[in-house]
Design a protein with these regions (language model features):
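Small cysteine-rich, disulfide-bonded extracellular modules of the LU/uPAR three-finger superfamily
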Residues: 1-95, 102-147
Length: 147
């Protein structure tokens, strides 16, 4: 199964991107997290709208690192990450995918965000109606962000 998800870039990410232009501190999207926090609890067929001020992914049930080849470009300003779940990775309810960034470079060697383990943060959140995944399902969530 494959699903397309358009994720909202969070305010904290926009702040980091603005600071990157000044300081050179950089990050990249390194992994994703899955939760069941993306649907309307009163109507699971409806995705909730992500709040750009959110800073975490809620009740995470699974995380996985991206590997080379997991990102493609729908257009020059629209990267898409393939969030691949193998059979047995997740069972149960899924309605939210979070793209997680890791600080990769700090021009100031005393910056604590670059001390290992490097700082990680939620870059973007994609929500969808509730999906139920069984132990035998192989699922790909194609998560895009737009600039």
């Amino acid at each position: 199964m494959a699903f397309s998800v358009l994720a909202a870039v969070l305010t904290q990410t926009k702040v980091r991107m603005a600071q990157m232009l000044e300081t050179g501190k950089s990050f990249k999207i390194t992994h994703f997290a899955v939760s069941a926090d993306g649907h309307d609890p009163l109507d699971p067929t409806t995705a909730r709208t992500p709040d750009p001020s959110e800073t975490d992914c809620g009740s995470v049930i699974f995380t996985k690192a991206f590997v080379p080849g997991d990102v493609t470009y729908t257009s020059p300003t629209c990267p898409t990450w393939a969030c691949n779940l193998a059979a047995g990775d997740v069972t149960g309810s899924v309605s939210q995918i979070c793209l997680i960034g890791t600080v990769e470079y700090c021009p100031n060697p005393l910056d604590t965000e670059c001390v290992l383990p490097a700082t990680e943060f939620v870059v973007a959140i994609g929500t969808m109606p509730l999906k139920v995944i069984t132990i035998h399902d192989t699922v790909t969530f194609n998560v895009s962000i737009q600039f």
